[in-house]
Amino acid sequence: MNRRSMMMTAALLPALATIPHAASAQCGPDSVAQVKARGKLLAGVKFDTPPFGFLDDNNNPAGFDLDILRAVAAHIGVPVEFTKVTSVSRVPLLLSGNIDLVAASMTHTRERERTIDFSMTYYTGGQSLLVAKNSPITGVGDLAGKRVVVQQGTTLEKTIGRLAPDARVTAFRDYDAAWLALAQGRADVLTGSLTILQGFAKNNGGFKIVGGLLSSEPFGVGLRKGDWAMRDAVNETLQDMWTAGAYAKLYEGAFGSPPTTPIEVWPA
C-alpha cells in the first residue's frame, strides 16, 4: 500500500466505524419476532386494482399481491390480516406501525427509497393508456388538451405529467374513481398499470388500450427503513415460491400467462 492509499484509508476509518451503529439504530427490534409474538402479520393492500388486489364475488379479499403476502405469513408461521390502503395512505400507515409491510402495486423508486425499503422485485409491469374504442387517441402524442385521469400519489401521475405536459390531468384517490370518470365520459383517457387497464377492458366492453408501454414499473413489497428481518422473510418467501413453482402458478392464475421476469434466486 502506498502512502496516498494509507492516508485515504486512515481518513475513512472514523466514518466506517460509525456504520454498524447507524444500521443498528435503523433496524430496532426484530420485527419478525414481534409478528410472531403478536400472532399475525399486518399487511397493507389495495382492493381496487384487479388482479393485484380486489374483493371477490363473496366480498373476500383476493388478488396476486394478497397471495404473495399470504405466502410470507405462512413462511413466518402466522396468519395475515389485511388493511385497505390507497396510494396516498400506504407509506404513512407503514411508517406509523399500523401495518408491518405493504404490497399494493407499488413501484420501487429511488425517491421512495429515501423513506422506506423494498423487497426484491416480485412483478415488472408498465404504464399504458385506456380509451373508448371509438377514440381517435393512439398514444401520448395525442393527449394535448385531452382529459386524462390517473391515480393520485403514484409514479403513473408523474410519468404522464412528464410525457404529456399539455394534457388536462386529474388525479383521483383510487382506480375505481378514475375508471368511473372514464366510463361516464368525464375523461378521455385513463392511464395506469397495463395489467390493471387490461382488467378494466376485459370486464367492460367498449374500451381499448393504446400507446404501448410508457414506462417500466418494478413492483416491490414496501418495508420500514432498516427492517432487514422482514425484508429477508419476504425475499426468502419469493425465492422459495419460484423454486417450488408456486410463484408461476399464482402468476398464471392472475394474469393468464407465464411469468415474463424470473425471481432472482440466490445460492444457499
Where are these regions (language model features)?
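N-terminal export signals
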Residues: 5-24
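Extracytoplasmic small-molecule ligand-binding "clamshell" domains
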Residues: 27-105
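Short helix-initiation/N-cap motifs at beta->coil->alpha
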Residues: 66, 82-92, 135, 154-155, ...
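Extended ligand-binding regions for polar small-molecule ligands
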Residues: 66-75, 141, 146-147, 154-155, ...
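Acidic, polar ligand-binding/catalytic clefts
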Residues: 70, 74, 79-142, 211
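A ligand-binding cleft/hinge motif common to bilobed small-molecule-binding domains
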Residues: 89-92, 105-114, 159-162, 183-215
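Periplasmic-binding protein-like
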Residues: 123-131, 177, 194, 198-238, ...
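Ligand-binding clefts/hinges and TM-proximal coupling segments of bilobed small-molecule sensing domains
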Residues: 155-172, 209, 239-268
